[in-house]
A protein has these predicted regions:
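Divalent metal-cofactor coordination and adjacent catalytic microenvironments
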Residues: 1-295
């Protein structure tokens, strides 16, 4: 028996690199996370905690803000203006690479030119005139390929959304290009920041950039050389700071909610770290509240 498999895709990425967290003023001893472990083990565990903190943020945000490509299926209805409005699961929407539609989910028709779509922060609008089909405000016409208002349509589409948050593969001072580990979401003409401590710098992608490529031409030469693994992107600093705060809170939490019996005084109860550091998490969530997706 054939098995149906969803085309919907889900990925999970960290909002910070290990070095970005280490460079932040957190007062955390991140070299003693694994008892007896070497530096590689300490860094691996720190990376795991950062990923868990990022996942916690995604749960609150109802989406991931790291630029990635998604394929989704959705049933929609043609509106009164003869348009199809898509509300993807992730935002902000950067690009649309494919769109298929039809009244039969097993026989969808592809949109020939995705550049004709109208982009909004959390929506994509597809006018039926761009699909080469007929539309009547009075309902479906009496021949194939016609649609009317409120008619249900099956759609499948692939898009990119989120903020670029990748790492450098190679970057040499004086060079007019660099390579990254993942080019998803990078756009020609857009500015991005390299997060490299005292050597941090801002770059702008040249108009010759090919969408999705890991080789990124620049409008001006790099001022510094940057090692592999250095973060680059346009992720808002508030989001990165929120991840730093949540990671710090996760690292501080220990099982210390105990009662201490003294000989000459009343027993005292220690305040658990999960309560003590809830303020850090609350501040972090407040910083990213504007990016929550309303479903």
């Amino acid at each position: 028996m054939a098995v149906g498999i969803t085309p919907d895709t889900i990925q999970e990425y960290p909002y910070l690199t290990v070095q970005e967290y280490k460079d932040a003023p957190t007062s955390i001893d991140y070299n003693n996370l694994v008892v007896g472990g070497n530096q590689a083990a300490q860094d691996a565990e720190l990376a795991n905690v950062i990923l868990r903190a990022s996942s916690y943020m995604n749960e609150y945000l109802n989406q991931s803000l790291v630029a990635d490509q998604y394929t989704e299926t959705q049933r929609v209805r043609v509106n009164g203006q003869g348009m199809i409005a898509l509300h993807p699961n992730n935002s902000p929407i950067i690009s649309l690479s494919s769109f298929q539609y039809g009244t039969d989910p097993n026989n969808l028709i592809a949109l020939p030119d995705c550049s004709t779509a109208w982009f909004e922060a959390q929506q994509l609008i597809i006018p039926l005139s761009n699909l080469g089909i007929n539309y009547s405000s009075q309902g479906p016409l009496g021949f194939a390929g016609s649609y009317g208002p409120r008619q249900q349509v099956f759609t499948e589409y692939t898009y990119v959304s989120g903020f670029v948050n990748t790492t450098i593969a190679t970057a040499t001072a004086g060079a007019t290009s660099l390579t990254v580990t993942n080019g998803t979401g990078i756009l020609a003409g857009q500015p991005y920041r390299i997060y490299d401590g005292s050597k941090s710098e801002r770059i702008t992608v040249a108009s010759t950039y090919t969408n999705g490529s890991t080789t990124v031409p620049l409008t001006s030469a790099l001022a510094y050389s940057h090692a592999a693994g250095v973060a680059i992107g346009n992720m808002p600093n508030a989001i990165k700071q929120a991840c730093i705060l949540i990671t710090t809170a996760f690292l501080k939490v220990r099982g210390d909610n105990s009662m201490t019996m003294n000989l000459t005084t009343q027993p005292t109860v220690n305040i658990g770290n999960n309560a003590r550091y809830s303020g850090e998490i609350a501040l972090a969530l407040d910083m990213v509240n504007k990016y929550r997706r309303i479903r």
